[in-house]
Amino acid sequence: MPFLKPSKVSLKRILQGNPPKPIGLTEYGHLLRLVGLREADSKEENERTILKLNEGIIQMHAIERLDTSFIKEPFRTLNHAINAESLPSLPDQEPWNVFQNAKKRDGQYFAVYSKLKDDSSNESPNKQ
């Protein structure tokens, strides 16, 4: 893969630089070609994107330097297989719609919210 070879604008050098070097317009153009995107029409938009990329790379390097030795299980995954048959189909979505079902049950949050809404609608517009 040519973009991983050590060169001035390689992805590997950009992401693994120690300390990380800021991405410039040349590196940004290289990354855009790498992922198949076009540059933005305005120079300001490109500069904002480059700034965000540089901030993200700096944060990534900071996270890599954190001491995580105290974490016993850093990545938890599902320990059981998912049965695709048990997932809801389109006509069967209603039991899975949490907010709609909570409104139907008229739980405490929704009861208080609806009471506040009713009280505010009873006030006259001239009342201060």
From Swiss-Prot:
Major place of residence: mitochondrion
A Gene Ontology term for the protein's cellular component: mitochondrion
GO biological process, any: glutaminyl-tRNAGln biosynthesis via transamidation
InterPro entries named in the record: Gta3_dom (IPR049545)
Pfam families hit by this protein: Gta3 (PF20978)
Disulphides: none
Keywords: Mitochondrion
Transmembrane segments: none
Compartments where found: Mitochondrion
Protein's name according to its UniProt entry: Uncharacterized protein C777.11
Species of the source: Schizosaccharomyces pombe (strain 972 / ATCC 24843)
